[in-house]
Each structure stands twice: as structure tokens, then as C-alpha cells.
Amino acid sequence: MSRVEGLTSWYSDWQGLSAAILGIGVSGFAAADSLRELGVDVTVYAPEKHTRYNKLLDAIGARYVCAYLDELCEVDVDFIVVSPGISPDNPVIKRLRDRQIPILSEIELAWRVRDKVNTCPWILITGTNGKTTTALLTGSMLAKDGARVAVCGNIGTPVLDAVRNPKGFDYLVVELSSFQLSLLPMHGNGAVKGFSSACVNLDEDHLEWHGAKELYYCAKSRVYHGTTGFCVYNLDDEETKKMVEQACVARNVRAIGFGLCVPDVGQVGIVDGILCDRAFLSARKDSALEITSVEKLEKNKLSMRHIISDVLCAVALARSVETNPLSISRALDEFCLSPHRTEVVAKEMGVMWVNDSKATNPHAVIASLSNFSRVILIFGGLMKGVDVSGIFDRFYETIKAVVVIGKNQSFVGNIKCKKIVCIPDSNDPMSEAVAAADLLATPGDTVLLSPGGSSFDQFESYEHRGNCFINAVKDLVKRK
């Protein structure tokens, strides 16, 4: 066993070790900062110069080397920390492993040093869609109940920053992407063990990175591995149930289902418009605990089907750590969705304009379309190797027309729709898409930006894409 494998605490002997951090960003810097605080000699390798991080790395005493990944096969260090953008199947990573160099992720490192201030339960959340919303919902419920909670991970705040917070936390709600999960070990001291774990839903995504649907699903399933308290799964998504059934977990772990249906014992669901818990109350065999109503959720724009599913998942996770139902209800009354998630931008001349730019895969588009009856769909972007035909087969009667954006529109041949308008690449593709949608729309229609792909071919981010849509719609309304 290497010396690194035996390091299971902030207070272990890290002094004098050397580490290479591959990639820089918020998680890479958090790793560098933490390791320097532990007395580790740190060198950060990244292919581009990041002026902001260069100065920060200098300040903490870490070195920065501008280098590409394939230049690092012979790096000589005690261990390596990789960014979540680097595949564990990368040839360089494989070669480094062959040299017996331990390779950690920021999440594994955070797990090893989680006791710096205090050791608290981790609530792990993943899914193809809705994981950020579910994490924020769960965090808000725990906080409303008086707990000190950090929502961290893929959502943006590094887990290492949370575990080093001098005040400590009662819970960490950790959002995990498939990239982050694929880097986590299944065994040993670095294997993360959540108290409660959930996969919100599952569908094809990031196939260009994982290589196959099965490998993507396998990465997601790791969220349940080692769970010590509760595995929360989606009753409307059979794959998540299979994951729980196949997971290696601690003894006496309970499986809790959630879904848009009347709940059975051990489940969270809906009865006559009331969200109910039949999983965590002692009299669950013959009664249910009321949490809130769909009517109340509607007042806070949380009543779309896929959002209610996220709410139910968060309710299950919050109840798994004994959060008071009244606190959960109050948190839901105050919760606001993040922008670019089925966000109503305008209602003009009987047409509703909806920004769902966060929908970066077909599963998210399907979830969004399920809420509307007649849609002009603005669709396209970097499709990440997934098949889009299922969307248009399933919603042929719902989708009145498709306005296609994106530089590569080769997928258009897989679209089955009554009307297709392709927007050529330009300096302002979104304004052209909005103008085209306006010509197609009639009273009673919804114009829905739900692209189904990443934004980076024409926009800086999904937020930028969504803001371009919002601005184009506002300009259109002004002209009318």
C-alpha cells in the first residue's frame, strides 16, 4: 500500500509529499490550496495560462506549468489530482497508473480530509437532469430546519472549500456529475460513502466522453456505492431502481422510492394533488404525512412535472435526515428556481415564450415538452453523440414546428416534424431563431427554447444562450 492510500484524515502526515494537479479551475485551485495547507509540494499543470489562477497559485506557494496532458507521462510525484474533465480511460492517466502513481479526484481528496473541522453526513445527488435543482431544494429544506448546510460539488462550490470552512457544517449536500463519479474509487480509504444518495433520473448523455450508454450509466450508479443510510430512487425511472438493487451498500440501508404517483409504503409521492411521505413516518403502513400541495408549488413556479419530481426527491432526502415536514413545506414556499430552467420570459398575443436553455440533452427536452400541448421548439447545439429522434417520435403531435440552431445541423435528418426551419450560423443566431419562431407561432402556442445540446458551438455557456433568447424576445415584444 502506498503512503497516500493510508492518508485518511486532515491530521494524517501529508507533510513532504509531492503532488501534480492536472487542470485548473475552481476545483483544481481548491485542491492546490488544500494540499499546500497540508504541507504538500504542489505543481499545477494546465494547457492554457489563467492569469487569475497564476497569481493565486503564486500566493499559496504552488508552481504553475503550462503543459498539455500528453506531455505528463513521465511526471515524478507521489500522487496526482485530476480535474473532472479528464477521463480515467485517457492513455496518459492509464500510463501513470501503470507506474503505480496514486490518482485522486478533488472529491476523493475532500473525503479523505473531511474531518478538518468536524465530520458530518454527506448527501450525494446525481442524475442526467435536475440534480442541481434537487441539491438546492434539499439544502434549502435542511437550512430551514436550522441545520448548517453546504451545497457543493458540481454545482460550483468545491467540496474541499466546504470541508475546510472553519465553522463546519451539519450536512454536505454534494452534487456529482458523471465525470466526477467516474473518478471515484469503489473500494479503499478513498471510497466516498454517502449517508443518503440519489439518482434523480437517467438517460443518455455525454456519450462523446464516456464512449457508450452503459459506461455512462455505470458511472452514475457509483452514487449509491457504499451508502450507509438511504438509497433514494425514481419510481418513474426503472434504471435508477436497478442501480439500487445492484449497489454494494452498508447493512440495513433502506431503499426509498419517489414518483408522480400514489405512494406505497416506503415511498414519497402524490395523492389527489398532495405531496405525501409514506417512507419516514412510523405509521407508514396505514397513513401518509402531508408535505405540501401541487397548488402551493404552482404559486412558486414549481408545478411542472419534472420539477415536482425533483421536489419529491429532495423531500425524500430531507426526510432521510429527520427534517421536520413543516420546515420542508416552508422551504418550498420560499424556493426560487435558478434561471434558464423552464422560465417563462413573456406572454404576448396569446403566445408564451419559455427559456429552458439548461436543457442540454434529450432527456431534459422530453421533461420540458411534457408540460405543454402545442410547441414551436428552438432546438440544436453540440449534441454529444446522442440520438435525438426519440424526442420527435414521442412528441410528434405536440411539436408544431422546429427551429434548428447550432453550427452542425447534421442531426436534422433524424427529426420527424411537420415543419423544420434551419437557422444558418451567424453572429446572432438566437435573434434569427426567435424571429422565425414568431412567424410560425399562433395564439395558444408555446415557443420553447429547449436545445437538447451544449451551447459552446455558438455561445459562451447555456446561461449566455438563455440570455440571448430573453433579450431577443424582449426586443420582439417591444417592436410589437
UniProtKB/Swiss-Prot annotation:
<comment type="similarity">
    <text>Belongs to the MurCDEF family.</text>
</comment>
<dbReference type="GO" id="GO:0009252">
    <property type="term" value="P:peptidoglycan biosynthetic process"/>
</dbReference>
<dbReference type="GO" id="GO:0004326">
    <property type="term" value="F:tetrahydrofolylpolyglutamate synthase activity"/>
</dbReference>
<dbReference type="Pfam" id="PF08245">
    <property type="entry name" value="Mur_ligase_M"/>
</dbReference>
<feature type="binding site">
    <location>
        <begin position="127"/>
        <end position="133"/>
    </location>
    <ligand>
        <name>ATP</name>
    </ligand>
</feature>
<dbReference type="InterPro" id="IPR018109">
    <property type="entry name" value="Folylpolyglutamate_synth_CS"/>
</dbReference>
<dbReference type="GO" id="GO:0005524">
    <property type="term" value="F:ATP binding"/>
</dbReference>
<keyword id="KW-0961">Cell wall biogenesis/degradation</keyword>
<protein>
    <recommendedName>
        <fullName>UDP-N-acetylmuramoylalanine--D-glutamate ligase</fullName>
        <ecNumber>6.3.2.9</ecNumber>
    </recommendedName>
</protein>
<dbReference type="GO" id="GO:0071555">
    <property type="term" value="P:cell wall organization"/>
</dbReference>
<keyword id="KW-0547">Nucleotide-binding</keyword>
<dbReference type="GO" id="GO:0051301">
    <property type="term" value="P:cell division"/>
</dbReference>
<dbReference type="GO" id="GO:0008764">
    <property type="term" value="F:UDP-N-acetylmuramoylalanine-D-glutamate ligase activity"/>
</dbReference>
<dbReference type="GO" id="GO:0008360">
    <property type="term" value="P:regulation of cell shape"/>
</dbReference>
<dbReference type="InterPro" id="IPR005762">
    <property type="entry name" value="MurD"/>
</dbReference>
<keyword id="KW-0133">Cell shape</keyword>
<dbReference type="GO" id="GO:0005737">
    <property type="term" value="C:cytoplasm"/>
</dbReference>
<comment type="function">
    <text>Cell wall formation. Catalyzes the addition of glutamate to the nucleotide precursor UDP-N-acetylmuramoyl-L-alanine (UMA).</text>
</comment>
<dbReference type="InterPro" id="IPR004101">
    <property type="entry name" value="Mur_ligase_C"/>
</dbReference>
<dbReference type="InterPro" id="IPR036615">
    <property type="entry name" value="Mur_ligase_C_dom_sf"/>
</dbReference>
<keyword id="KW-0436">Ligase</keyword>
<dbReference type="InterPro" id="IPR013221">
    <property type="entry name" value="Mur_ligase_cen"/>
</dbReference>
<comment type="pathway">
    <text>Cell wall biogenesis; peptidoglycan biosynthesis.</text>
</comment>
<dbReference type="Pfam" id="PF02875">
    <property type="entry name" value="Mur_ligase_C"/>
</dbReference>
<keyword id="KW-0963">Cytoplasm</keyword>
<dbReference type="Pfam" id="PF21799">
    <property type="entry name" value="MurD-like_N"/>
</dbReference>
<keyword id="KW-0131">Cell cycle</keyword>
<keyword id="KW-0132">Cell division</keyword>
<keyword id="KW-0573">Peptidoglycan synthesis</keyword>
<dbReference type="InterPro" id="IPR036565">
    <property type="entry name" value="Mur-like_cat_sf"/>
</dbReference>
<keyword id="KW-0067">ATP-binding</keyword>
